[in-house]
Swiss-Prot record:
Does not possess a ribonucleotide reductase activity. Betaherpesviruses probably use another strategy to expand the dNTP pool in a quiescent host cell. InterPro entries: HSV_RIR1_betahv, NrdE_NrdA_C, RNR_lg_C, Rrm1. Keywords: Host cytoplasm, Late protein, Virion. SUPFAM superfamilies: PFL-like glycyl radical enzymes. GO terms for cellular component: host cell cytoplasm; virion component. One of its GO terms (molecular function) is ribonucleoside-diphosphate reductase activity, thioredoxin disulfide as acceptor. Residues 1-70, 89-129 are annotated as: Disordered. The keyword Lipoprotein does not apply. HAMAP family: HSV_RIR1_betahv. Belongs to the ribonucleoside diphosphate reductase large chain family. This is Ribonucleoside-diphosphate reductase large subunit-like protein. One of its GO terms (biological process) is deoxyribonucleotide biosynthetic process. PROSITE patterns: RIBORED_LARGE.
Length: 906
């Protein structure tokens, strides 16, 4: 190594974590907080009475750590004392540097016995990464940066390799960061005086986009694009094309770039094996994406700035992205032990046909991975999953090993779900630590992970979490979302107008968490009220405070007993500590669970009327327009999604540790979601109110196709999942039989034949549908998210671009920056409009106006969803807590598992 390079590397690596430069926002001095007992907190905030607390120490009582609180909004995480088997993790201030740099907070660990993980060693993540042989990118100019993960990189080396791959070098200055350009200007509020001159200038610059021309085109689009779209929504497509042209000079259009050492070994071997055929396929894909793709400005930003990566200084082309995804999925299918069976169910004879089939589904947007997985699949030493559900009982101590595992997962861009009320640590300290570190990650990465904090509402620690949300709004953590596990006993007492509700310490609350059956939980709860220490609160006030936190702190409501009662598990199971961060996937095991999302685009099943003979088939639903919905195409897409999901599970288990394989083999969950439901209804000319039967029929066919494909895999010779005997499928039941018997559109003979095959051969998978938000995937393909209705004909969404980006002279933390908001056009509404003044009447309903219709449709479709349905609730500024409580009681009676995913102002 060059001595100069060695000195530079040593200089950069010596930068301490969370370093503050002169001129930056200084951190607050630590302030000692007054200790409050659980009874005082209950009486002050919730409305409880000190006399209601029985004598004796509260199990699981929390104390404020004396380490102090730092300003989380300035980007510094707060840790307040985590016990780790005799060792204590604490923050200590370092002495100021001679140049006057403010003191920094460094993470130290007192001496104490180490706490090994389950494998006898500290595990940094789910996938088995190989840090040895990790390539180092040589930068033209090494810039001094804040290595906020320096202390964590020593424990988890794969983080540094992941950050090298995730980063980009900007085209304008050559700075290493997360964006392709620097200096996003404030968008213009008014239209330019001469719009034709502006369009001519964009066209001229796009023809000479090499060098600084691309930066000039980028500035013109960001400056005038939002205002132009608001004035004329149809120009959104043209601006999207110009946005792609700004990147043409730096794009790599050869598929041989995926033979790089940055890519996975299976992808490299596949590319080298088919190096003669891939260039032609890449050229056809690029031409299709350019001509047939519906890329608006917001979709183009998602594609180029969140999905595309940079390989050796060159950006991926949009066509190359879909080719990489198809190659990675094909390699996962071919490298599986069951590749022959997978090819049979995909109706392909060799891997070339598999590649063509997968590529067609990907580029058309019929089947889609999440935007995070689309950006990482095919690369080496990066996670191949979307979320992590942390349910490992060995993490209850919140030790250094557990914190490193969660932080390393966040550093890779993966969102995490954690139940803080079941940890042997101060809940507020865990939230501050994980939330502060997550905010630091969100400053550096394009994919912004979140920490979903779950709270058991029968634990006394829930009071501390509610106080934390209500009182510390000034230092709100942008990367933290909350979820409240509401038991049935709380809803029943509110319905019966009982004023007393009890909260227990951790030993008692954990014992209650082991009782998944509603009757057993209520019986043990009544017994504990008579014999155990407790905190008594007012039921109405407690629920109102919880809903106020939901409106203020981006929290969701989970009816945890409904999750167990209407699940596939036949045996008695524990109450799940947490769902997935998107509130769609359930997990019933006592181990960490990675979640892989796969979305079916329902809007791609709508076709124009061209074949008159096909219109009379039983699987065809005619619309009020000249379009029809083909249910047979939907079943075909779901069948291929099941094959893709099983191949991805095989690839994930082969690259992970033994305990990950053991967790996935129990139920082999697929987590299949939907997108574009409201877009399909608008194109058919239907309203949500008139489409309840159609929506129920769509999800019936999806569930039937998923179960049939899983049975056929076992029928072909694959083994059934391990927990098949513990599910309702062992008894010959389907998920909709746990509810009322719906009106089935599929013939009963087909259901009975499926039941007989299921009892004879078993199921390869036991969890299929999980209707999550998947909003970025929907916006990428120009459709509505999930089963939600469209918010409007033209509405705004936040982008990854910031109006106050960091530079060498000034630094703004995440909470100070203002993200660039770009209008998003509803193309289903735009399709039926002509020129200005000649617009036809299009059937369109905004989401706040048809919220009740969407909820009723969710009630009908939830009988076929074996996991959860995440909904959006639109509220008015004048809505009182009593109205929210009434709606919450309605969601409970409708047997929703998740009361609401998020709250939005109408």
């Amino acid at each position: 190594m060059n001595p100069a390079d060695a000195d530079e590397e040593q200089r950069v690596s010596s930068v301490p974590a969370h370093r503050c430069r002169p001129g930056r926002i200084p951190s607050r001095s630590a302030e000692t907080e007054t200790e409050e007992s659980s009874a005082e907190v209950a009486a002050d905030t919730i409305g409880g009475d000190d006399s209601e607390l029985e004598e004796g120490p509260l199990p699981g009582g929390d104390k404020e750590a004396s380490a102090g609180n730092t300003n989380v909004s300035s980007g510094v995480a707060c840790v307040a004392g985590f016990t780790s088997g005799g060792g204590v993790v604490s923050w200590r201030p370092e002495s100021p540097s001679p140049d006057g740099t403010p003191s920094v907070l460094s993470l130290t660990r007192d001496s104490g016995p180490a706490v090994p993980s389950r494998g006898g060693r500290v595990s940094s993540g789910l996938s088995t990464f190989n840090p040895a042989g990790a390539t180092r990118m040589e930068l033209d100019s090494v810039e001094e940066e804040d290595d906020f993960g320096a202390s964590l990189c020593k424990v988890s080396p794969p983080i540094q390799a992941t950050r090298m791959l995730m980063g980009k070098k900007c085209h304008c200055h050559g700075y290493w960061g997360k964006f392709r350009f620097c200096g996003v200007q404030e968008p213009a509020r008014e239209l330019p005086s001469d719009r034709n001159a502006l369009w001519r200038e964009m066209d001229t610059v796009s023809r000479h986009s090499a060098g600084l021309g691309s930066f000039r085109l980028f500035q013109l689009i960001m400056r005038h694009g939002p205002c132009l779209i608001r004035h004329s929504p149809r120009c959104d497509l043209l601006l999207g094309r110009f946005y792609f042209k700004a990147n043409w000079a730096r794009e790599s259009r050869t598929p041989l770039c995926y033979a790089s050492e940055l890519c996975d070994e299976s992808v490299r071997r596949f590319v080298l094996r088919h190096m003669e055929d891939l260039p032609k396929l890449a050229e056809e894909t690029a031409r299709f994406v350019e001509l047939a793709g519906c890329w608006g400005l917001y979709a183009a930003i998602l594609c180029l700035d969140k999905v595309c990566r940079q390989l050796h200084g060159q950006d991926e082309s949009p066509g190359g992205v879909f080719l990489r995804i198809a190659v990675a999925l094909t390699a996962a299918i071919e490298n599986s032990r069951h590749s022959r069976i997978y090819r049979f169910h995909l109706d392909a004879r060799f891997e070339g046909e598999v590649l063509e089939s997968v590529l067609k589904r990907c580029r058309d947007g019929q089947l889609s991975l999440s935007t995070f997985t689309m950006s990482t699949v095919g690369f080496d030493r990066v996670p191949q999953y979307d979320f992590l559900i942390s349910a490992d009982p060995f993490s209850r101590d919140a030790s250094w090993a557990a914190m490193c595992k969660w932080m390393s997962t966040l550093s890779c861009g993966v969102s995490v779900s954690v139940n803080v009320t079941r940890l042997n640590a101060d809940v507020n300290s865990v939230i501050r630590c994980l939330g502060g570190y997550c905010d630091l990650i969100r400053e550096k990465e394009v994919h912004r992970p979140v920490v979903r904090v779950f709270v058991d509402m029968w634990d006394v620690a829930a009071i501390r979490v509610i106080n934390f949300i209500l009182k510390e709004s000034t230092s709100e953590l942008t990367g933290v979302c909350y979820a409240f596990n509401v038991p049935s006993v709380l809803m029943k007492r509110y319905r019966a107008r009982e004023q007393r509700y009890s909260l227990f310490g951790r030993p008692v609350s954990r014992r209650l968490s082991d009782l998944g059956q509603e009757s057993a939980f209520e019986k043990e709860y009544s017994r504990c009220e008579q014999s155990c220490p407790k905190v008594v609160v007012n039921t109405d006030d407690f629920l109102k405070k919880m809903l106020l936190c939901a409106l203020k702190g981006r929290a969701s409501v989970v009816f945890v007993h409904h999750v167990v009662k209407y699940s596939i598990m036949a045996d008695s199971v524990c109450l799940p500590p947490c769902l997935s961060p998107d509130m769609a996937s359930c997990h019933f095991g006592e181990c960490d669970m990675p979640v892989q999302r796969l979305t079916v685009n329902v809007a791609r099943c709508v076709f124009a009327r061209s074949d008159e003979q096909k219109l009379h088939l039983p699987d065809v639903v005619l619309g009020n327009t000249r379009r029809y919905f083909d249910l047979s195409v939907l079943r075909e897409l779901v069948t291929e999604a099941v094959v893709w999901g099983n191949a991805r599970l095989d690839a994930l288990m082969s690259a992970s540790e033994w305990w990950v394989e053991s967790a996935l083999e129990k139920l082999r969950p697929l987590h299949i979601g939907v997108a574009g439901l409201h877009t399909a209804l608008m194109r058919l000319g239907f309203t949500y109110f008139a489409s309840w039967d159609l929506i129920e029929r769509i999800f019936e066919h999806m569930y039937f196709a998923a179960v049939r494909a899983s049975v056929d895999l076992c029928k072909s010779g694959l083994p059934r999942c391990e927990w098949f005997e513990r599910t309702i499928y062992q008894e010959g039941k389907f998920i909709f039989e746990l509810y009322r018997l719906p009106r089935l559109s599929i013939a009963s003979a087909r259901w009975e034949a499926l039941r007989a095959d299921m009892l004879e051969f078993g199921l390869r998978n036991c969890q299929f549908l999980a209707v999550g938000p998947d909003d970025e995937v929907a916006h990428l393909w120009g459709v509505t998210p999930s089963v939600w209705a469209s918010r409007g004909t033209v509405f705004e969404e936040e982008t990854v671009w910031s109006l106050c980006p960091p530079n060498r002279e000034c630094y703004f933390p995440t909470v100070v920056r203002r993200p660039l908001r770009v209008p998003v056009v509803n193309y289903a509404w735009l399709e039926q409009h002509q020129e200005e003044g000649k617009a036809t009447q299009c059937l369109f309903q905004a989401a706040p106006a048809i919220q009740n219709d969407v909820e009723m449709a969710a009630v009908n479709l939830s009988v076929f969803v074996d996991q959860c349905v995440a909904l959006v609730f639109y509220y008015d500024s004048g809505m009182t807590p009593d109205v929210l409580l009434a709606r919450m009681l309605k969601w409970y009676h409708w047997r929703f598992k998740v009361g609401v995913y998020k709250y939005c102002a109408s």
